[in-house]
Amino acid sequence: MNADAVQQYQHRTVLLDEAVDALALGGERANGVYVDGTFGRGGHSRKILQQLGSGARLLAFDKDTQAIANAATIDDQRFEIAHDSFATLSEALAVRGIKQVDGVLLDLGISSPQVDDATRGFSFRADGPLDMRMDTTRGMSAAEWLATETEQKIEKVIREYGEERFAFQIAKAIVARRAVEPISSTRQLAEIVARTVKTREKGKDPATRTFQAIRIFINQELEELEVVLNEAYRYLAPHGRLVVISFHSLEDRIVKQFMAGKANVPQPDRRLPIRAIDLPQPEMKLLSRVKPSAAEISENPRARSAVMRVAERLSPAARVVQ
């Protein structure tokens, strides 16, 4: 990708207006406490700050050191960023004495600048070190993991996190190749997969699923998502909004099931003598499922797989059936 194309992608936040609107920042809520769990390059945070009142507070998270450096350009006493995973939400709020929040926004996946920077190792389109860590200051790189992991575990990761039907063959090829030389670059891994996967999906590079799987595993993306969903719910004030943008089916499935589990509760047999006030009540209300418009996808093709789900925490009074 040339420099112009890289620049083109750097400042495009997917579903920017829709996500911030979903937080419902008007009225008294304008002076609430909000969380941007994935600062990235700050598109959502900056727009949220534009709509918040002087008494509001916005706490952002990001594991990427480049994102933290970018956040330093925001000179606003209402804003603070934590160099950590959003899975540490509970600890971060407790340290700051925050008892509840009025909205949580999560924009999952990786940002365009991360993909386009070959030194990060996220993309198979340009050669670079096989790293794939969101936070390059911590943890094991993809190259280090592939050098030591068992063939069975590599297969499991590629199959489960990449939904790759050739996971067995790819894992076998990786182990065979590492016996000859270290697999230390994105090009090496992409070539291994390309030689192994004989059936090609239309419009998709054969390495797509394998790179996704390893990235998800290295960064514990799905485990951290499950943690933050529960912590966000725990801290949401009545009528607080949970807004989540996901980019692949594994993420979206977790978000959908979590929200549905809070919104839909099993009802006991109606023939049982149970008072209405004692019946199980929903804890959240499902508000919307939004996809990017055709216009946004045309301007930013990377938005095409995005899905935004929005739910609102119900107040105790609202959860009682009258």
UniProtKB/Swiss-Prot annotation:
GO annotations of cellular component type: cytoplasm
Organism: Janthinobacterium sp. (strain Marseille)
EC assignment: 2.1.1.199
Name of the encoding gene: rsmH
Record's keyword terms, sorted: Cytoplasm, Methyltransferase, rRNA processing, S-adenosyl-L-methionine, Transferase
Subcellular location(s) of the protein: Cytoplasm
PANTHER family hit by this protein: 12S RRNA N4-METHYLCYTIDINE METHYLTRANSFERASE, S-ADENOSYL-METHYLTRANSFERASE MRAW
Family of this protein: Belongs to the methyltransferase superfamily. RsmH family.
Molecular function as annotated in GO: rRNA (cytosine-N4-)-methyltransferase activity
SUPFAM superfamilies tied to this protein: Putative methyltransferase TM0872, insert domain (SSF81799), S-adenosyl-L-methionine-dependent methyltransferases (SSF53335)
Name listed for the protein in its UniProt record: Ribosomal RNA small subunit methyltransferase H
Binding site for S-adenosyl-L-methionine: 42-44, 62, 86, 107, 114
Swiss-Prot/TrEMBL GO biological process terms: rRNA base methylation
